[in-house]
Design a protein with these regions (language model features):
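N-terminal glycine-rich anion-binding loops that anchor highly charged ligand groups
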Residues: 21-22
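Divalent metal-dependent catalytic cores for phosphoryl transfer on phosphate-bearing substrates
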Residues: 8-12, 35-108
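Generic N-terminal amphipathic, Lys/Arg-enriched alpha-helix
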Residues: 1-15
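A generic alpha-helix surface/boundary motif
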Residues: 4, 26-27, 85-87
Length: 108
């Protein structure tokens, strides 16, 4: 998945307010990547996808984690406010073709 595809994907999954937040997070992630010598595209991709599961319900997030327990890393035992990142990383790997472990870790 490239940055354009990620941007289109999250646009379709998020409310206007959350989408604007996500674009601002991407800008900050790129600034931080530049400052610390990290790959800017990877930082931007992770930032774009992190909140991609933020607006789905708890039951759907639970189902995603249960369908992929090997990727959920005990997600259900974690506080529910962090479930969206775990689920976003699972979806990125299983449905959206993201394979880079650093990106997936940053999404989660």
């Amino acid at each position: 998945m490239n940055l354009k595809q990620a941007k289109e994907l999250v646009r379709g999954r998020l409310s206007d307010k959350r989408y604007e937040h996500t674009l601002n997070v991407r800008k900050m992630a790129v600034k931080l990547a530049k400052r610390y010598g990290v790959d800017e595209d990877k930082a931007a991709l992770a930032a774009l996808l992190h909140d991609s599961a933020k607006e789905i319900g708890k039951d759907e997030m639970r189902a995603i984690m249960r369908a992929h327990p090997e990727l959920a890393e005990g997600g259900e035992e974690r506080p529910t406010p962090v479930w969206h990142g775990i689920c976003a990383a699972i979806l990125a790997r299983t449905e959206w073709g993201v394979e880079d472990e650093a990106v997936l870790s940053a999404i989660a």
